[in-house]
Amino acid sequence: MHPIRHAKALVRERLTELVRSEVRAEMRATATLAAQVVEARQADASRLASTYDHTKNPNDEFYSGLADRLRRAGVDVQTRQVDVARFADWVEAHAGLGAYYGDSATRVEKLLEHYLAGESTHLTAGMTYIDVAAAGSHWVPCLRHAGLDALSLDLSYPQGVRGWRIGADAQKIPLPDGSVDAMSAQCAFEMFQGGADVGFISEAARLLRNGGGLAIVPLYVDDTYFIATSPYTVVDPDSFDEDATVVWRDDEYDAPFSRHYSPEALADRLGDTLALFSQVRVVHMTNLESVRERWPGSRLYAYFMLESRK
């Protein structure tokens, strides 16, 4: 065969193999999704996240009980209240950030998470700060405008450090030891699959300077240790914690993975790694009802925040 014809034949053969491989993979994924959707629709209450997820119907007394269980598990728990007047002033001063969240029921919750993280880590001009799993958040641009050397980190960004964006796994951040003053994760930590929750805390301890702070808000603590997954996504079964109950999401969100610790699981799973910090506490916010009264109709669930200092 002529060399050019032979080369063309090899290319066609290779392309055909690639297409067939992609089609087979897509068919397998589609079949898996279809089976999951059927299973989720037929599942009884014991297999549905709404049975276990108390953030959908918050109860202050319930979360106070969880705080007591955390203490019995050996966790340092500090009660704290949102200064509603001060937070209202902050919301007004960050109107642009509020506009990003629109008129959703979680708008005030999202703003509260940023506010609490900033208060916890004492963010001020000149500090180096990383917003972990930032995705499309406008928080870092706000902080940069205020004079901070603020950086956004997300796995979805192009890999490497590119200006103020870092594309990397939160367990392997390409920055030197002790180069960061503060870090926080807002409504993100619960989505860290497999051992990434433990791995991230270890990485934060490496990156933070002595005295630097880490805030994780909300810290999802619930009565039962469970992981919620969407039937509309395919998750590697090995990423589910062995001792957690795995349930189907039955809300409007399609997030593939959301981990809620029980008080005992939190202490057992994270305790050794958190020992890398000089100070660790879980902050229990006890007056979210007052925030709801100020902004009626808001869905609030930042009852707990993990606050650590290097």
Spans of model-derived segments:
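Extended alpha-helical heptad-repeat/coiled-coil "stalk" and oligomerization rods
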Residues: 1-51
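Class I (Rossmann-like) S-adenosyl-L-methionine-dependent methyltransferase catalytic domain
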Residues: 7-10, 42-172, 215-310
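Short amphipathic alpha-helix with an adjacent loop that forms part of the alpha/beta core around
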Residues: 172-178
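A conserved beta-strand element that flanks and buttresses the S-adenosyl-L-methionine
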Residues: 184
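Short catalytic micro-motifs in class I SAM-dependent methyltransferases
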Residues: 187-191
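Short N-terminal helix/helix-N-cap motif within the alpha/beta-hydrolase-1
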Residues: 193-195
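A short glycine-rich, Lys/Arg-flanked "PGG" loop and its adjoining helix->strand segment in the class I
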Residues: 198-213
